[in-house]
A protein has these predicted regions:
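Non-catalytic pre-domain segments flanking phosphatase-related domains
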Residues: 1-34, 42, 194-252, 257
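Alpha-helical substrate-recognition element adjacent to the catalytic core
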Residues: 2-131, 252-263
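Hydrophobic helix-cap positions at the C-terminus of alpha-helices
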Residues: 66-69, 113, 144, 148, ...
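Residues at the starts of beta-strands that form the adenosine-phosphate
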Residues: 73-76, 158, 186
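Short catalytic/ligand-binding loop motif for oxyanion handling, primarily in non-cytosolic enzymes
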Residues: 85-89, 132-134, 168-170, 196-197
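Short, surface-exposed alpha-helical segments at coil->helix boundaries
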Residues: 100-107, 138, 174-177
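Conserved Lys-Pro-Asp/Glu-containing loop-to-beta segment of HAD-superfamily phosphomonoesterases
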Residues: 136-174, 257
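Acidic, Mg2+-coordinating phosphoryl-transfer loop and its flanking beta/alpha structural elements
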Residues: 160-203
Length: 263
């Protein structure tokens, strides 16, 4: 059980799978964010300072909700943006956890899930760069579905994604909500998932209104700029044009219709 990396057209993926006997392929996915959805720093900071700085965000009885889903046939996959790890490795003086610390921390988390909660079947997918794998872009989900699920078609309407960044007041982004919307799956925030509360029919609609009210609108221009590094020169003018449109729309509150036609 070691971390693996893939570099493809959509960018860079870091991922981890359990040993063979615990691997599951399923039509139904329980996707979750990692930080502040499953774990949090012990010392009260927003970001962990080392590999030992984490604890589960809820009590044991609530963590058992994850095992219940796995026992009912769900594939449990964690999708996490970790763009700060490489910056931390470059700036050692910042006292932030780097990539090696993150990997060691994950080993500690998985060991606790196994020993304390009897949860063995866990997949971890990590985005390290501002490319098409970074949430709310859908690259990590697509990698899971087409590379780690034996080509089984996922029933997105029966799957769901749980994350804390929902565009609410106090959330620093709406990335988790928008990730679920882009994927086309159901969305829950951690406090709803762990309490097994019934969702109102307009739950997502209310959150979307909060995204605009709290100015948590996603700016996709930086993702396309990052992706520019990996595309051919013949396609660069196209992405430059799209980037300018996104910047104009985001800055000046304009609306554009962009059609992408494949062949």
């Amino acid at each position: 059980m070691a971390f693996e990396e893939r570099i493809g057209q959509g960018g860079h993926i870091l991922f981890w799978q359990p040993e063979d006997k615990f691997r599951i392929n399923s039509k139904q996915i329980l996707g979750m964010d990692l930080d502040w959805t499953i774990i949090k720093p012990i010392r009260g900071k927003i970001h962990p300072i080392d590999e030992n700085d984490c604890e589960f965000i809820v009590k044991d009885t609530e963590i058992s909700r994850i095992k219940h889903k796995i026992d009912n046939g769900y594939k449990f996959v964690i999708f996490t943006n970790q763009g700060g790890l490489l910056d931390a490795d470059k700036n050692k003086s910042d006292k932030k956890m780097g990539l090696i610390g993150f990997k060691n921390r994950w080993v500690n988390i998985y060991k606790k899930l196994q020993e304390e909660h009897n949860i063995h079947s866990v997949y971890l997918i990590v985005s390290l760069y501002n490319d098409f794998n970074r949430k709310p872009c859908t690259g990590m989900w697509e990698f899971m579905e087409f590379q780690l699920n034996d080509n089984i078609k996922v029933q997105k309407d029966k799957s769901f994604y749980v994350g804390d960044m929902a565009g609410r007041k106090g959330d620093h982004s709406s990335g988790d909500l928008l990730f679920a919307l882009n994927v086309g799956t159901q969305f829950q925030v951690p406090e709803v998932f762990y309490s097994d509360s019934k969702l109102s029919s307009n739950f997502t609609s209310v959150l979307i209104k909060d995204v605009y009210k709290n100015d948590k609108i996603f700016n996709g221009a930086k993702y396309i700029k990052e992706f520019d590094k990996n595309i051919s020169r013949s396609n660069k003018k196209i992405t430059d044009d799209i980037t300018n449109i996104l910047l104009d729309a985001n800055t000046n509150n304009k609306q554009y219709l962009v059609l992408f036609i494949g062949k």
